[in-house]
């Protein structure tokens, strides 16, 4: 999403900042009431303070989103989850996070050769920015949405790491319009540190996503964060630069995960895969002898967020994701079944029976055999997938 002029960008920032201010004021009020034992629903009506800048519909939408966050918080408490009350958009040191929510009937979105989006503006800024009473802020939109059914609330945000404005449009799609698997094949994934994903399918295809090059800048950023933390005064635990590096690191990781998941799911869909088995790493995540592997597994691979992305993307294609235990898959020889005398060194796997192979690909193949009851014939070399 791009403003059409410097003036439009300034107005967009003003709208996003006002929305963040509204969210933070309401959140502060409700948090104080919550910790004082009072009802959070008795908070001040902040809509009137912001309707002049945002317009009535947008101000109400931000308040409604805040209320949804509190209802989710209370529901989690009732389920016994260890959770915290809704937080703020930004903080005092770094400033507010520029975000807003636009009601589903308040934004015309035209997709074409020059896609555009129009969002409402309150009356107060219109004279300053040369807008008429009925005018809206017009923005250029890049990309084409996959779905075009009933549109939901629009989420706008500013990404300070990439210095870009973004837009997210949830769409309600009937089950009849979602893709269905082309066949009833299965796939098994070995999620790891050096190879982010090793995959084997019942059709005999194997895919390997190498994470070493992607991990290198992640590791360098982590080391720079540690260096800057060592220079802080004793009474401080962070700085604007450190927090920005954390956000940069997370954004790069999330981008890599999104690209990997999308690429993998599209390949599996083309192979006719209907079910994907993923190893349960709960026990692995509880600890590992190597601090470097721990860093990769916990922070870079971000297993749980990876699974969430995989399940959400797979759902678009009608593919089911199942989490299963993967005991002995990294030690078992796919040729003879030996577990005790096999050896592994990095990506290489050996068995006394004479078998040699790729450790992670063999693990995914063995895992697939455990879950799908089949040991498919695979090619001599898996397709290494390189993501930009």
Which positions does each model-derived feature cover?
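Nucleic-acid substrate recognition interfaces
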Residues: 1-388
